[in-house]
Every structure is written in structure tokens, then in C-alpha cells.
């Protein structure tokens, strides 16, 4: 009797072990079957590219409910949107954060096989009552207005970026030739504040979070901002290759549903402490500085449903033609597709 029970126990153990082995193996099989979404960031962190907060492990584990089930993110952190556009063109990314100039240049060159679409907002500039892209000088500088920049050295993060375009439009509107009347240099965003203070440049652009951090130190003042050059416009946004949208529409929708859910989670007042903590950690900024602007009217405007219209995309496109950065006008409408978002956008 004992032996029979023992024999049955051994069989039970073997059967149970096999079942357990199968059970343990199942997550690996399921994980391998979860579609991969390759995302290239645009070089920003925190407020100036809020999707980078979504990409943090804490957000993926606690807020992005579809991650690991309907899709898995494979992220490449780039130095700027031109690099992100290059990854799309090379077939090494499915989604990316692009600036308007990087997007327009890729469209004009037909660089991305199969084409690409703008599928979600990131943030917009020149919205009344919200933060803007700001160019700063030293408090004691003789530069008071845009015309005073003649003969001066001005820093942007990279040529061909959104802030570079903004600068050129502002200069031209005030009678200055960007090619002859000023010297424009490339300096990374985190280093522009020091470059102004050390007088290596006379003026420089400091988007969030860098502008807030430098303002807190004192000694700088604004000369002009985005709304002085352009009407409300899209600065950066999410794009996806048309090949990916056609091959994996459910994956695209799952990611964008999580993106919108994450955006609304960040803005919810009950989550503010954690949201500020995440943004401060990511941007390596003091929490009290982040708390002074992040997700308030001192921050950039973001549509709560990530909606973006062609009317916010067209002005910079037209400005690029006027500045000779595009040889022909691009109509934004065919390239804006909000249908992959979880809720319809109003017309």
C-alpha cells in the first residue's frame, strides 16, 4: 500500500514536474511572441520630450498596462531628431520623435522607405498662456531686442532643428540675415547656459528643463521666444513608418493608447509628486525646480489626447520654404494621421 502510494506519488511528482515545467516555459514563449516596437527618441529629456518619461522602467511597470502584453518597447536614445530620422530611413526604427525640420527634410528627400505619418503630439510652442522656446542673454547684456543681435554669436543645439528654424525666422522678421548678420553655433542644450555665463556666446536658446534650471540660478533674462516668430506650431511629435502602421496597426494603437493613458496619469493631481520625481530623476534637475514648471502653465502646451492638426504643422513648413531650407512647399494634411490614437480628435 505504501509502495503503491509511493509509486503514485512519483508518477504524480513527474506529472506535476512536467506540468510545472510547461507552466514555467509558457511565459518565455508568450514573451517571445509579443511584438516589438522600435522607438527612437529625439534627444530630449523630461518636459521637452515627455515621451521619455513614459519610457522609464517605473512607468512601463506601473502605468503602461499594455506594455509586455501587446507590445514591447525597444528604445534607442539619440542625440537629436536628425539622428532619429536617419534611423527611420535606415529601417532601424518604427516610431520616432521628430522635430518639424527633421520631418520635413526626410519627406523632401523621400528618405523613409514607404513613407511616414505624424501620429501623435508631443508639445507645441507659441500657445498663449503656456511656456515657449526662449532665447536668453546675460542680465547686464546690451542686447535688449532682436535687432540688437546683429554681429553677435547665438547658440542652438544643432543646425536644422526646430529652435534653429525659430531663430532664423525671428531674425529675418526683424531685418537681420541669419547667414551674414549673426554667427550661429552648435552647443548641446545642457551646455548653453554655461556658454552664455562664460561669454563664449552672446545669446542662446534654453528650452525646458534647461531654461528653468538656469533661471533659478539668476543672471539671465529673455530676449525673445517662439511666439515672436511663429503662430502656434508643433515643435516635436511622434511619427511612425507607414510600413509599420500597415503591418502592425494593433501594436501602434496599443502603444499610443498607453502613451495617452500615461500622459493623463502624469497630469492627474494625485500623481503629481511621483510625476515630478520621475521628471527630476530623468533630467537630473532639482525636484523643486521641476515642480516650479512641470505640467503647469509654466510648461509647454500638450494636447491631453495627443491630438495634433495639420494647422499646427503647416506654419513651420512654410517658414522653411521662406528660409530656403525647403525647395518646394509641403502640404501637411496628407502626412497627419491621428486615427491610431485611442479617441477621435476633433476636426
Task: Name each model-derived stretch.
Residues 1-8, 19-22:
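N-terminal secretory signal peptides
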Residues 4-14, 27:
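Twin-arginine (Tat) signal peptide motif
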Residues 28-32:
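Sec/Tat signal peptide C-region and signal peptidase I cleavage site
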Residues 33-177, 183-186, 202-208, 232:
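Short, glycine-/small- and polar/acidic-enriched structural segments
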Residues 84, 99-102, 145, 163-166, ...:
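Stable alpha-helical elements in mature extracytoplasmic
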Residues 190-281:
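Pocket-lining segment of extracytoplasmic ligand-binding domains
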Residues 246-327:
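Secondary-structure end/capping motifs
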Residues 317-347:
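Conserved C-terminal helix/tail region of periplasmic/extracytoplasmic solute-binding proteins
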